[in-house]
Curated annotation (Swiss-Prot):
Keywords: Cytoplasm, Hydrolase. GO terms for biological process: urea catabolic process. This is Urease subunit gamma. GO terms for molecular function: nickel cation binding; urease activity. InterPro entries: Urease_gamma, Urease_gamma/gamma-beta_su, Urease_gamma_sf, Urease_subunit. It is found in: Cytoplasm. Heterotrimer of UreA (gamma), UreB (beta) and UreC (alpha) subunits. Three heterotrimers associate to form the active enzyme.
Length: 100
């Protein structure tokens, strides 16, 4: 399987998000990389499904809550920027204050 660096990054994010979902299901709180991966994966998959940029910017801020993260993680993450592929091309999606 020949993957481009971008495709490898997408797979790594997807795997990290799967790990994060499993930890949430077990009642574990998320660390910084897990929180970022979960939000990023949500945006990438939403773009793949054809959702609008504005919709993903808003919905991305409701993927996880501060209670689902370790102490201090929500304060560390001000914005999450994701370069996602939409049906009409690649766009940058910025989720402001993603953990509330």
């Amino acid at each position: 399987m020949n993957l481009t660096p971008r495709e490898k990054d997408k797979l790594l994010i997807s795997l990290a998000a799967m790990v994060a979902r499993g930890r949430l299901e077990r009642g574990c709180k998320l660390n910084h990389p897990e929180a970022i991966a979960l939000i990023t994966d949500y945006v990438v998959e939403g773009a793949r499904d054809g959702r609008a940029v504005a919709d993903l910017m808003e919905a991305g801020a409701h993927v996880i809550t501060a209670d689902q993260c370790m102490d201090g993680i929500a304060a560390m993450i001000h914005d999450v920027q994701v370069e996602a592929t939409f049906p009409d091309g690649t766009k940058l999606v910025t989720v402001h204050h993603p953990i509330r």
